[in-house]
Amino acid sequence: METVSSSAIGLVIAIVVVVASIWIYKAATGVMPGAKLVLAPPAGVQPSGVEENVAKFMFFYTTWCPHSRKAEGPWKSFQQVLKNTPRKYGGMTLQFEDVNAESQTGKASLYGISHYPTFKIQTKDSVYEFVGVPSVNNFRTALIGTFGQETF
């Protein structure tokens, strides 16, 4: 008969604790850990710089990051979709901004950017972070979930 080592039991207990913690967090907040929604702007960010009913959608990237280069395609495609067929999300008009974190280090620092690519959405009152695989559909889904119905 085989005996189970105490380290194997410890590993199983650790996994159970981590999984339980994730589900408790999700039940308490409504989102999975890692899905960020920043309800207050980071220190130093002045949300009043954005007009009422405008959402500034920012793409923070670096030229050396392969993930940034991969995200650029869906980002540009989404911009083109809105250029071809203008639409609003919950009454919010989108403005796009590309931020090269290498040359615009102050802006990247102001928004607390530590990894690339990062997508932030700033309104008059709040700053949100898009977390997910960059794609036209995922951008649309996130904007609908954050602001409301997509209207043409």
Residues of each region from the PLM?
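A short glycine-leucine-enriched loop at secondary-structure breakpoints
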Residues: 109-114
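Thiol-based oxidoreductase modules, predominantly thioredoxin-like and allied folds used
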Residues: 60, 79, 84-106, 133
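Extracytoplasmic/secreted envelope proteins and their assembly/folding machinery
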Residues: 72-79, 105, 136, 140
